Amino acid sequence: MPTSNVPLDAAFWIWGCVLAVFLGFAIYPILTLGPYIRAGCRINIHRNRIPPDNKVRQPNPNGDAFVLFLSGVGRVSALTMSRREQGILHRLAELCSDAVLLDDVFAYSINNLPLVSHRRLSPMWRWALRQKLKKRLHNSALGYLINLRNILHILISADSRYAMVYNRGCAHVITDHLQQYGYDLAQPKPLVIVSYSGAGQIAAGAVQHLSDEYRLPVYVLMLACFFTASGIDRASHVWEFIGTTDQAYRFCLLFSPSRWLIPRLSLWRRLTAAGRTTRIDMGAMKHTGRGGYLDRNSVTPEGVPFIDATAQAMADVINRIRIDTESPKEA
């Protein structure tokens, strides 16, 4: 009687999938950075043509500060499709009316090119986006291919082997974008980068080049962000907004030893000791979804919707930066 090969076949496919994933992770940074390096680290930056909505993306060279919002890992292009993110952007625009608020930088692309604009892969990403927007569990799970792809870019930004090249490209995208809205690199105004979730690593990586190469005064607001401390020391100040029930943030912090406060010589500990980091307790807020920072329905003990409390906490910091940077000029 012939023996069954089912266990052997299953093991073959399992190990084959593991090997394919490993090889994919190994060569993806090369595929991502290869064209950029071949072009001499100068590549055509994709410029989005997203019209202003009367609150966000309003060119104003007379603005006293520029605020750049970098979205979480679920985005496929510079235009956010999240109602929660749109909600906090509009609230920040109202609370910081004298600042120029921008949101149309795709943080997970070295040349700002949206996933849906790739000539060969755009059909796949459009399909993944459609699946993600569906409410069925198995469809939305397939849509998380977008998140996985963007997480790979976060890992590239954090990897010391590729970080210098990748983060420098992201800084070029940011400065090119700022100039479209009237930012003068010769007379730089305060640049406030507001990052959500995984975009914190992109911001931390770009800060080093924005400060060293372009001499910009950069302030970073991290909303439940995952990032390594490398490069963030070039920021003038870093604020972290963390909820007490955000377990995703605490889990990811385990994989960032440079931000642990226990090692005496850790960069994050030195920044904290120097008074250049501030942690703001957001109360019982989760990372995302119901009960998250951007939830409209959950409320604080004072009855304030979570999204309004988050926007107000960030606006207080942004307005303080604007006042503090204007005071020396008036004196």
Predicted regions and their residues:
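Active-site nucleophile loop of the alpha/beta-hydrolase fold
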Residues: L221-T228, G243-Q247
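Gly/Ala-rich beta-loop-alpha elbow adjacent to hydrolase catalytic centers
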Residues: V194-A199, A203
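Short coil/turn segments at beta-strand junctions that form active-site/ligand-binding loops
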Residues: G63-A65, A99, Q187-P190, L216, ...
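Active-site catalytic motif of lipid deacylating hydrolases and related acyltransferases
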Residues: C17-A20, I27, L33-R47, L68-Q187, ...
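Lipolytic serine-hydrolase domain surface
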Residues: R234-K329
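Short, surface-exposed basic-aromatic patches at helix termini and helix-loop junctions that form
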Residues: Q208-L216, I232-F241
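Intrinsically disordered, low-complexity regulatory segments
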Residues: M1-A65
